[in-house]
């Protein structure tokens, strides 16, 4: 997926785990079960790192900053890869985007 501006998720967008899922750490991996579809999703590496932050609640900008602190990655590459990951998680109904922090 390209990261053209029509698909860019703003940095102040709050990312929240979809309520109808459960997840668990399995070593360095996160395993997510979507309760409506019964599908399991495995996240490794940076994906698992992002998922742990999403479970706690974070904005796109906070996620990007945390990735850059934890991993050695160029800013543009970080931004593009994060946008792609979040779009994929949203498409699979594993995350939701909100303008305000979740309550």
Task: List PLM regions with ranges.
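Hydrophobic packing positions characteristic
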Residues: 1-21
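Long, charge-rich, low-complexity alpha-helical segments
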Residues: 3, 7, 39-103
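Short, functional N-terminal and low-complexity linear motifs
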Residues: 15-19, 29-35, 52-54
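Short alpha-helical segments that sit at the start of domains
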Residues: 24-47
């Amino acid at each position: 997926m390209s990261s053209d501006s029509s698909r860019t998720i703003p940095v102040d967008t709050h990312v929240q785990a979809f309520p109808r899922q459960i997840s668990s750490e399995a070593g360095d991996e996160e395993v997510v079960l979507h309760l409506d579809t019964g599908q399991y999703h495995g996240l490794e590496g940076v994906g698992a790192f992002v998922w742990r932050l999403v479970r706690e609640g974070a904005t796109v900008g906070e996620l990007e900053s945390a990735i850059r602190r934890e991993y050695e990655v160029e800013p543009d590459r970080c931004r593009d890869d994060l946008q792609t990951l979040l779009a994929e998680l949203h498409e699979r109904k594993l995350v939701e985007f909100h303008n305000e922090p979740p309550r």
